[in-house]
Structures are given as structure tokens and as C-alpha cells.
């Protein structure tokens, strides 16, 4: 499988790092090579190991010092609770280049949310302004915006190692019918180009159902629909899920959805959608790195993150796709003789939960 060097093994010291919002949700101590504490460290700008009392920068892996030399205040769960002293510690170095985010982008995000007025308004693809990829070499930039009634994070990542789109996985299970539920009047060719650009940029392996979205730009892997229903299997589709998240797979095959925790005082990652976790830990929630150390999830599934489809509502098509490159006149895919059938209405039905 093609991917950027080092991504499959690690992003820091050979150990996995995953960024969700402004928090590092999983990282392994560079001294022990393991998870020393369930709350090893919480925030992406400074990382600490309470057992070994060291502090390092998870962005580039530079060890800053021990806790005795460089005292870092205990960070609260939410940015709104941070004090001026905390913010001073958390201020990242100024980058030479920052993405130019037009104000109209944020205005469009607030105005054209698909969940505006309490119901889904699938007009996202028509109204969002064009926003191209950020320049390579940038530190990760998080852009917070309103999505319905909640604040979510738009992810803008640099395109070069050591951090190469940590939230975009090696393997993406994609059902274009579910993508079509959020984007209206988007030609099939444009959806294909979007997937192609993601594939080129991230090196991810894109897996599509075998009987939908004929492609001419690239050859994605095809998964037989007869293996399992897409709505209940590889890519669970929950229309009621309001927070963006990622999917890991338990060793028993059950999907596990993660997202930010809504309550104060709890870990900032919540594991949902599987009774398996609650049988083991009752009401507690742990990061997959903790589950990994206890043998509850497979090692491969810890690295091969599967993109939850609501994530596409937080990464608009205009973010990943240049408007000029789209051929909006090409509404029908080119099908070679004896090729696959074009998408039918059955692929664009919403899934009931």
C-alpha cells in the first residue's frame, strides 16, 4: 500500500501520534516506548509523561526538559477554561506562512450548514467558496467554525512529513451514495476527482462498493456489497451523530466510533456505538491506545483508521477540490462497453438509524 514514509509506523520517535482538534489523543512515551498512564498527556502543543517527568513537543519530537526544570500547569479539558498563564505556555511558534482563509469561507460555513433550522439542508456543495490546499511545510492549522449548533474543527494539515494528514487514514471505505446525501448537484466526475485527489495527496487506499461509481481516473479497490451491508458494516452511517469522529475496529469486529467528549472532567475522547467497551469498562471511555495495550483492538486497526462519513461534512468539497478543476457539465460518468452501471437512486437513499 502506498503511503508517505514513516506514517504507518509513527509520527514521533517511532510511536503513533493522532491529533484531534488541538489535542494529541494518543502518544507513547519516548522513554518507555509504551503508554505509561491512561492520561499520558492531553494537548498537542506540549506533551508530558507524568511517570518519567519529561516534556516534549509532539509536533517535531523535541524534548523540552523535565517537569522539574520546566513546570507546565495542568491543562483543563476545554480551551474556554484555560487561563492566561496556560495560554502563554500553549502559544505555538509563529509560522512563516499561514493559510489565507477568506472571511467569506467562515460566513458560508455558518450560513449554509446542512443542519440549519433543525433539518438537513443538503446544499453544501453549491455555496461554499473555493479553498485550495494549504502550502506544504506548514504546521497543522485548526480552523474552528460553527456547524449547526455546535463548534467543530476544520482540519488544514501540511502535506509533507513528518505530519502527513494524521486524520486521513491509510484505508478509506467510501460509499458515494452517502456522500451524495450531503452534496447536491455534484456530478459523478467531480466526486471521482475528489476521491482521486485524496488518494494522490494522502496515499490512502480507497475502497468503494463494487457496483457503484465507475471511475476512469484511477482504479480503487472494490469490496463486494454482499459481504455486509455498508450502512451496518464497514462504514456505519449514523444520521443522528452530531460530532465528527473516526472509526476503529474491535478485535471482535464491532465498529467503534470516537468523538470529543461532551462533558467536563471526562477524557476528551469518547468511545461510542459498541456494547463491547461498556461490558469491559462500564461507563468509562478510553483512547484506542489504552485499548491496544490491553489487547482489545488489533494493532493494524489502530493504524488503519477509517474515516467516518460525517467527517466529509467537516472537510467541505471546496477545501479538497479546486472549483476550476471541476467539469460541472459532465453530469454522467463515462462508461466503457461492458462496464459498471451508473449510480441509481438506491445508492442515494439516506440510511435510517
UniProtKB/Swiss-Prot annotation:
Residues 289-322 are annotated as: Transactivation. A motif (PDZ-binding) lies at residues 350-353. The keyword Plastid does not apply. It holds the Pfam family Tax. Residues 116-145, 213-248 are annotated as: Homodimerization. GO terms for molecular function: DNA binding; SH3 domain binding; zinc ion binding. The modification Phosphothreonine is found at residues 48, 184, 215. The modification Phosphoserine is found at residues 300-301, 336. Phosphorylation at Thr-48 results in the loss of NF-kappa-B activation function. Phosphorylation at Thr-215 results in loss of CREB and NF-B responsive promoters activation. Phosphorylation at Thr-184 and Ser-336 have no effect on these Tax functions. Phosphorylation of either Ser-300 or Ser-301 is necessary for localization to nuclear bodies. Thr-48, Thr-184, Thr-215 and Ser-336 are highly phosphorylated, whereas Ser-300 or Ser-301 are only rarely phosphorylated. This is Protein Tax-1. It comes from Human T-cell leukemia virus 1 (isolate Caribbea HS-35 subtype A).
Amino acid at each position: 500500500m502506498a503511503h508517505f514514509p514513516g506514517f504507518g509506523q509513527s509520527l514521533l520517535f517511532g510511536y503513533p501520534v493522532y491529533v484531534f482538534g488541538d489535542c494529541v489523543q494518543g502518544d507513547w512515551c519516548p522513554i518507555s516506548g509504551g503508554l505509561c498512564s491512561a492520561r499520558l498527556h492531553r494537548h498537542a502543543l506540549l506533551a508530558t509523561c507524568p511517570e518519567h517527568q519529561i516534556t516534549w513537543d509532539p509536533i517535531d519530537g523535541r524534548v523540552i526538559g523535565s517537569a522539574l526544570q520546566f513546570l507546565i500547569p495542568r491543562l483543563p479539558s476545554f480551551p474556554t477554561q484555560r487561563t492566561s498563564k496556560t495560554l502563554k505556555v500553549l502559544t505555538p511558534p509563529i509560522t512563516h506562512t499561514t493559510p489565507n482563509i477568506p472571511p467569506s469561507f467562515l460566513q458560508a460555513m455558518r450560513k449554509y450548514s446542512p443542519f440549519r433550522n433543525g433539518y438537513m439542508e443538503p446544499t453544501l456543495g453549491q455555496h461554499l467558496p473555493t479553498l485550495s490546499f494549504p502550502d506544504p511545510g506548514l504546521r497543522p492549522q485548526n480552523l474552528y467554525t460553527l456547524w449547526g449548533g455546535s463548534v467543530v474543527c476544520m482540519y488544514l494539515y501540511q502535506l509533507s512529513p513528518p505530519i502527513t494528514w494524521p486524520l486521513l487514514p491509510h484505508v478509506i471505505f467510501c460509499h458515494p451514495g452517502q456522500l451524495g446525501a450531503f452534496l447536491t448537484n455534484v456530478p459523478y466526475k467531480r466526486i471521482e476527482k475528489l476521491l482521486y485527489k485524496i488518494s494522490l495527496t494522502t496515499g490512502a487506499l480507497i475502497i468503494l462498493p463494487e457496483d457503484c461509481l465507475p471511475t476512469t481516473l484511477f482504479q480503487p479497490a472494490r469490496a463486494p456489497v454482499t459481504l455486509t451491508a455498508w450502512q451496518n458494516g464497514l462504514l456505519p452511517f449514523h444520521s443522528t451523530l452530531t460530532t465528527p469522529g473516526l472509526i476503529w475496529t474491535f478485535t471482535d469486529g464491532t465498529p467503534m466510533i470516537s468523538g470529543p467528549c461532551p462533558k467536563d472532567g471526562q477524557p476528551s475522547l469518547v468511545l461510542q456505538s459498541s456494547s463491547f467497551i461498556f461490558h469491559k469498562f462500564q461507563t468509562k471511555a478510553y483512547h484506542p491506545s489504552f485499548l491496544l495495550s490491553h489487547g482489545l483492538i488489533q494493532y493494524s486497526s489502530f493504524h488503519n483508521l477509517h474515516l467516518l462519513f460525517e467527517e466529509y461534512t467537516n472537510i467541505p468539497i471546496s477545501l479538497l477540490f479546486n472549483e476550476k478543476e471541476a467539469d460541472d457539465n459532465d453530469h454522467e460518468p463515462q462508461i466503457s462497453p461492458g462496464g459498471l452501471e451508473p449510480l441509481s437512486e438506491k445508492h442515494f437513499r439516506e440510511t435510517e438509524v
